[in-house]
């Protein structure tokens, strides 16, 4: 039910979720926890499930907010590979992170926001380096 509920929140019907159920479970690596209520999931488990469902939807734009801040290294690498695959397929990725290495690795362009104000917009490495310099000063 966890998968169907999350899918419904994203506007996917039960038939679509049935069609992609095995793919979602396999990617999330939650096979042994698939029947455990979400309220008993850790934040990492919730993120795994949400990311797996979001990536089977094949949307034009995928918003990924700090997904790589949770989970183990192996799963983070799996997520990065999936994001690269989606980017190569034409999906626009809105990637939110405070991790400079991840931003530089996954993004060609970055926008640094500070309380909703655009501080910098440009190549990811340049924008992140300016952000990091500012953070070191404060």
Identify the function of each model-found stretch.
Residues 121-122:
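ABC ATPase "signature
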């Amino acid at each position: 039910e966890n998968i169907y509920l999350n899918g419904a929140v994203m506007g996917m019907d039960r038939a679509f979720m049935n069609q992609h159920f095995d793919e979602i479970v396999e990617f999330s690596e939650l096979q042994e926890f698939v029947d455990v209520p979400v309220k008993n999931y850790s934040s990492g488990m919730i993120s795994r499930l949400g990311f797996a469902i979001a990536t089977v939807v094949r949307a034009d734009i995928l918003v990924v907010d700090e997904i790589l801040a949770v989970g183990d290294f192996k799963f983070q690498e799996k997520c990065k590979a999936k994001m690269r695959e989606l980017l190569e397929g034409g999906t626009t990725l809105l990637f939110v992170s405070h991790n400079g290495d991840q931003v530089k690795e996954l993004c060609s362009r970055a926008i640094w926001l500070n309380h909703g104000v655009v501080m910098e917009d440009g190549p990811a490495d340049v924008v992140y380096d300016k952000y990091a310099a500012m953070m070191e000063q404060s």
